[in-house]
Amino acid sequence: MTATMMARVTGLAALLLAFCAPAQETAPDALVKGLVNDVIEVIGQNKDSRALVDLAEKKVIAHFDFKRMTQLALGRSWSQASPPQQQALERAFRTLLVRTYSTALNQTSGRTRVDVKSPNLSPGDTEVMVRTVVNEPGRKPFNIDYRMSKAPGGWKVYDVVVENLSLVTNYRGSFQSEISRSGIDGLIKVIEAKNQKQEG
C-alpha cells in the first residue's frame, strides 16, 4: 500500500472516531458503531479544507493516545530523547497526523459504508482490537483495525492497522532513518517542516 493510500484510509479511520461521546462505560466497538452514520453525513456535506482541519483538531485528539503513538513510532529512540525533545516530538507528530487525516478526508466519499465487528472483550480487559471493513463505491472492501487501550477518560486508539499495515510501524521506519541521518532534533525539524508545508 502506498503512502498516499495509507494516509487516505487512516484519514477515514480517524474521522470514524471523531464523533464519539467520551463515555467511560461505552464498549470500544460501540464507540465506532455509534458514529459511522454521522461521520459519513459530514463527509458528504463538508469538503472545506479548513473546516476539516478544525474538525480533526477538535474531535480526533480526544480519542487518540498521541503520546503512546509517538512512543511506538520512535521505538528505542524515545528513551534517548530528552523530556523537551519528547514533548516537541509528540506535539509535532500529533499535528502531522491531524493534518494528514484532514487532507485525506477531502478524498473520502459520503457513500462510504463501514461494517464494525464486535471484539472478544472480557471483563477487566484494557487492550482490544476493533476490526472494521470499509466499503467505498468503485473499490474493493478493505480492512481498518483499531488497536485501543482503556484510559481514565475511556477507550483510546494508539494504532491504526490498514490491511495489516500498522500506522505507527510505517512511521517508525522513516523516523529511524531520519534519526540516523540527523538525530532527534533533525527529525523534529523534518516533521515541523512537513506541518508547515501542509498548512501553507
Regions found by a protein language model. Give the residues of each.
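Bacterial N-terminal signal peptides that target proteins for export
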Residues: 1-11
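N-terminal signal peptide c-region/cleavage motif recognized by signal peptidases
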Residues: 18-20
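Early exported N-terminus immediately downstream of N-terminal targeting peptides
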Residues: 25-105
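Surface-exposed, polar/charged faces of alpha-helical domains
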Residues: 41, 45-51, 80-84, 111, ...
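Solvent-exposed loop/turn segments at secondary-structure junctions
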Residues: 78, 95-96, 121-122, 136, ...
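Surface-exposed, charged secondary-structure patches
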Residues: 91, 99-142, 194-200
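Short beta-strand edge/turn micro-motifs at domain boundaries
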Residues: 141-169
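Low-complexity, intrinsically disordered terminal/linker segments enriched in charged
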Residues: 159-200
